[in-house]
UniProtKB/Swiss-Prot annotation:
Pathway given in the UniProt record: Purine metabolism; IMP biosynthesis via de novo pathway; 5-amino-1-(5-phospho-D-ribosyl)imidazole-4-carboxylate from 5-amino-1-(5-phospho-D-ribosyl)imidazole (N5-CAIR route): step 1/2
Lineage top rank: taxon: Bacteria
Enzyme Commission (EC) number: 6.3.4.18
Name of protein: N5-carboxyaminoimidazole ribonucleotide synthase
Family indicated by similarity: Belongs to the PurK/PurT family.
Keywords for the protein's UniProt record, in alphabetical order: ATP-binding, Ligase, Nucleotide-binding, Purine biosynthesis
Length: 377
């Protein structure tokens, strides 16, 4: 099988690594340049989408912010999975909210803002405090504001109005502020025949809006809620592939915060922690192969490497530590790679995270240090 991935970043790279043992070949299409490249070496393989489509069996995507003309071409080929509808919903908060409502899953109360009058209505409908998010283009904490009191209204409106004016069809989605205890996510896969497999929930810690630490957890009640909502969304979309749902945990009740119609950062732990990783299961699904087991095989955490292109040699020497570099040029705050940390028995994972805190810079890895302080207290 030959799969074309829309996007030439680290997710396409890791799909390529997962596909090789299954004899699944991956090419990556750079939606900005129009180049078709090898996802590991970035060696140029060709140019132009239509020609690339002719030579592959399946088309999929590694991110949701894809120009609609490209999506239309891929959808018309009959080879694109999950679907242009799913990708669009992941890239537009208005469509995402409509999808969640249609699927009947809990999400924060919201109101769509396009004008100053809409902002006034949103304040009445949603209330203060509220979180405001750009409908298009926002990710990793970008394009977001928080309205805490009425004194901020005019200042925030000026910023939001500029955001709306800068991009055609842009809007702001106002959401009620949710006083959650923690953020969790569920990664799952749905096959062509409708079979569904989900991984254990992961608890996620964000720093400045960017995922820093993700740990697989055992929470049967939350797992059941999450799987029910995952199934509702996946079946509403007739989804094929890996899908991620991010949740707020509010006193033991889950609310969907976001969906991602693709393999996801909070699922990278599955590379070492699950029977079948998310990248392999995505390829299995879109290629019409049986889904692999999502069973947890060892306790695992994933640590994002942000803005760093080297690590102390002692990290590689530590038992249970697996480093995954993305081959990117160093840039402040950029996702450069991740570390999967595993433990085979209770407490071993936690002790290894504490050991990592002793050698990793606190400024670059704040969540690991915060975890260590709490664990050792």
């Amino acid at each position: 099988m030959h799969v074309l991935v829309l996007g030439a970043g680290q997710l396409a790279r890791m799909m390529s690594l997962a596909g090789a043992p299954l004899n699944i070949q991956i090419s990556a299409y750079d939606v900005t340049t129009g180049d078709v490249v090898h996802p590991l070496t970035l060696h140029l393989l060709g140019h132009g989408l239509e020609q690339a489509i002719e030579h592959v069996d399946v088309i999929t995507a590694e991110f949701e912010h894809i120009p609609h003309d490209i999506l239309a071409i891929c959808q018309a080929s009959g080879k694109f999975l999950p679907s242009s509808e799913a990708i669009k919903a992941g890239g537009d908060r208005r469509l995402e909210k409509t999808l969640l409502d249609h699927a009947g899953v809990r999400n924060a109360n919201y109101y769509v803002i396009e004008t100053r009058e809409d902002f006034n209505k949103a304040i009445e409908h949603v209330g203060i405090p509220m979180v405001l998010k750009s409908a298009l283009g926002g990710y990793d904490g970008r394009g977001q504001w928080r309205l805490k009191d009425a004194a901020q209204i005019e200042t925030l409106w000026q910023e939001m109005a500029a955001c709306i004016a800068a991009t055609p069809t842009q809007a702001i989605v106002a959401e009620e502020f949710v006083p959650f205890q923690r953020e969790v996510s569920l990664i799952g896969a749905r096959g062509k025949e409708g079979q569904i497999e989900v991984y254990p929930l992961a608890e996620n810690i964000h720093v400045n809006g960017v995922l820093s630490l993700s740990t697989a957890i055992d929470s049967p009640d939350l797992q059941e809620q999450a799987k029910h909502m995952f199934t509702a969304v996946a079946e509403t979309l007739n989804y094929v592939g890996v899908l991620a749902l991010e949740f707020f945990d509010v006193d033991g009740q889950l609310l969907v915060n976001e969906i991602a119609p693709r393999v996801h950062n909070s699922g990278h732990w599955t590379q070492q922690g699950a029977e079948t990783c998310q990248f392999e299961n995505h390829l299995r699904a879109v290629c019409g192969l049986p889904l692999g087991s999502t069973k947890l095989v060892r306790e695992t955490s994933m640590i994002n490497i942000l803005g760093e292109d080297t690590l102390p040699a002692s990290v590689m020497a530590m038992d249970g530590c697996h480093i995954h570099w993305y081959g990117k040029e160093k840039r402040a705050g950029r996702k450069m790679g991740h570390i999967n940390v595993c433990g085979d028995y209770s407490g071993e994972l936690q002790r290894r995270l504490c050991a990592l805190a002793n050698v990793l810079d606190e400024k670059a890895f704040p969540a690991v240090h915060e975890f260590a302080k709490k664990w050792q207290a």
